Regions:
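An aromatic- and glycine-enriched ligand-binding surface/loop that stacks and positions planar moieties
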Residues: 2-160
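Active-site beta-strand/loop architecture of penicillin-binding DD-peptidases
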Residues: 152-176
Length: 176
């Protein structure tokens, strides 16, 4: 946090610059992965990995950092699928400010790259060339629900902001 905060807020305090903190964080993360029982979740498909980490019906037997242990057999699961897909569940949606925190694929800040044009940019342009986790967090052009064949855009009857969450949404046999 300290490194990225200093980098994106232009803070230069005495001591170390932002690169020092980012390098220290990377070293600490590598130590945890190399020496601990944990590993990063990966199916070797970065366009789906982030979404699938949160959408599994049953917990993996592997030790992952940031994993939630759901078990369909033990009836330990969430209701996020229905919550994000049904209009009777409060119509959740992320704010534009939150969506703008997702970086571009090249690592640059979205709002820095597009200065003021981002404020009137069409949705399809706004989500183009972003960190792949954005398309695994909200419905973007080309979105297909897990196990479905039909492409679905954001359902404005279900999300009040237009940024419809898909994180935790499971396949079509789940509720919703």
């Amino acid at each position: 946090f300290e490194g990225t905060y200093r980098k994106y807020h232009g803070i230069n305090l005495e001591g170390h610059d932002y690169t020092y903190y980012l390098e220290e964080a990377a070293k600490a993360a590598k130590t945890i992965i190399d020496e601990g029982p944990y590993k990063l979740y990966s199916t070797k498909n970065p366009d789906k990995d982030y979404m699938m980490l949160f959408a599994q019906e049953n917990a993996s037997t592997e030790e992952y950092i940031l994993a939630i242990r759901n078990s369909y057999e033990a009836q330990v699961y969430h209701n996020a699928t229905a919550y994000t897909l049904l209009p009777t569940q409060g119509r959740p949606g992320y704010t534009r400010k939150f969506i703008n925190m997702y970086l571009m694929k090249d690592g640059k800040a979205f709002t820095d790259k597009f200065k003021t044009e981002w404020q009137t940019m069409p949705f399809t342009e706004e989500v183009k060339d972003r960190d792949p986790r954005l398309a695994q967090s909200i419905r973007t052009p080309g979105y297909k629900r897990i196990g479905a064949k039909r492409v679905q855009g954001p359902d404005l009857g279900v999300t009040i902001t237009g940024y419809q969450p898909i994180k935790f949404v499971q396949d079509t046999t789940a509720s919703g």
